[in-house]
Amino acid sequence: MWPRHVLTELIRNALAEDVGAGDVTTGAALRGDETGLARATAKAELVVAGIEVFGEVFRTLDPALVFTARKRDGEKAGKGDLLAEISGSLASILTAERVALNLLQRMCGIATLTRRYVDEIAGMRVKILDTRKTAPGLRILDKYAVRAGGGCNHRFALYDGVLIKDNHIA
């Protein structure tokens, strides 16, 4: 899928960016010892992508959290379908949820749109390929999501192959 250390660094950076010195709202609203169960459900029909990334965000923030995937990457989900459950410290769940949801929503969106294009060209002798035009730091996730949607990866980075464009022929 991807080098473990790359995903770990991406998640740590995302959590550091969002949490900073701490989640002041959760700290003010909770005692800190509450436990709970969170459920992630699909708000619309979609193609799942990034479900393990979603879980890894919670586990990175708090290894004691228990994550259970209910759908796998590449599967279709209908509106209201259960995608995953997270149980444990309510403070940890609330602190990690926005980063986890942002990554999951982005990846599912890419996979869903890719699948729509792949379905449109079914039966033709062509493939849907991605590009390097991704948000900095999120390329591994974006390209993974394309594959989950049935598309193919082109070049991962500049080192990955020669592609002469008009900018090179000046």
What are the residue ranges of the model-derived segments?
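Acidic/glycine-rich phosphate/pyrophosphate-binding loops and surrounding catalytic core
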Residues: 1-170
